Amino acid sequence: MKKLDRESVIGISALLVHTAKIDENYSEDEKNLVRNFIKSYLESEDEKKILKEAEEVENNSNQLLNYTNTIKKNSMVIKKDIIEHLWKVIISDNTIDQYESNLMRRICGLIYFPDKECAEIKLKLLNSK
């Protein structure tokens, strides 16, 4: 099921970092969640090194939504997993602000992921906290 190449994982991780930073609070918990995402797709790689690369990509990019093209090309199962990781990062600080909600709406629209399913993932994660 979990099949993404290294470059895709770096790009999607950069999007996760961007999502974590959008509320201007990039915590260690959020970094750990991004590392968990990396480990779930690249088991034999050094997740700290990949995270550092993703942070550099995020810092040097002015249009991170380009990485949604990488997501869009994948199966619905992988899209769902990525959306779940994005929501985990967002709710890790126990608040969802308007910028985070707007970002998720935009990402879901760009990758053709159903709003209803996105909302179900969000509710499932909120209820499991």
Region roles according to the model:
Residues 1-129:
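Small-residue-enriched hydrophobic alpha-helices in membranes
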